[in-house]
């Protein structure tokens, strides 16, 4: 009877892992020999005893070493797409790609601004007459032309309306003295004359009445001066209006100089003669202001003009007609060059923009006189 408790106690003192193995061994031994552990009676004809009660749970054993990692599991399915992250920095510039094919030509661009007006070309030879064009619109009224030949008297027309007063004309020449008029009324007393020579002392005369004050003569002189000043002012105003009328529309005034043109086109020598007959000379601009005044007349007539300067005496040395050297010049680029297919260029023309060029003196150009 004591062997059973001892067997149970022996089992409880064994580790759990070895317990299972021992139990398996004991089971096998029991099958081989039922009384190996428990001896009750001789094996012959004896019955096995009842199972004993389970023993108490033993103390927890020490934590074993970690096992070797198992094989990696299969990759799971991709999760849903996350929110779009912030824009990353630009990457470095890539290598330039190959040059593409030339594209088709683009549409024509807008017309550019008009360029500067070039210098006037040389006058070409007269071409053949063209076919008459259609009748144009009535143009503006032109300036007064030269007086024509007197025609035969026409029939008397209807009386026209009274015209507007004309501009003040130039002072006319003195006419023939008319017949003497009737004697007018006596005028005011004239100014006192100069004193005469001192005479001999005469006899004392009677005491006369008190004379008038000498201030009357002074006041009369002042009044006369005031009248003369008024007349002078009226003459100056009239001359100013006359000067404007003479200059309009083909004249320019700069300082004390007046530049005037009648629109004539002549050679250099004929142009000089025309200005001399008008008591002037060919235009001789001596400053930028005078040069611009001449250029304005050139633009108004749309024709280049002669200037008075030339190098007829000494090639390459341009002077005024008096022989004086130039004090101002405005040559175009590359001028003067004396280059006209062998024909000397000894005279000066002024372009519309005010630049100068040397030309043959025989070329017909606009005449502008200086007064």
Swiss-Prot record:
Family annotation (SUPFAM superfamilies): C-type lectin-like, Triple coiled coil domain of C-type lectins
Keyword Transferase: no
Domain Collagen-like: 46-216
GO molecular function: D-mannose binding
GO cellular component terms attached to this protein's record: collagen trimer; extracellular space; multivesicular body
Basic and acidic residues composition bias: residue spans: 51-65, 198-210
Residues covered by the C-type lectin domain: 273-371
Signal peptide: 1-20
Disulfide bonds: 275-369, 347-361
Any one GO biological process: surfactant homeostasis
Motif Cell attachment site per UniProt: ranges: 201-203
Primary site of residence: secreted
Family stated for the protein in its record: Belongs to the SFTPD family.
Protein name: Collectin-46
Source taxonomy: Eukaryota, Metazoa, Chordata, Craniata, Vertebrata
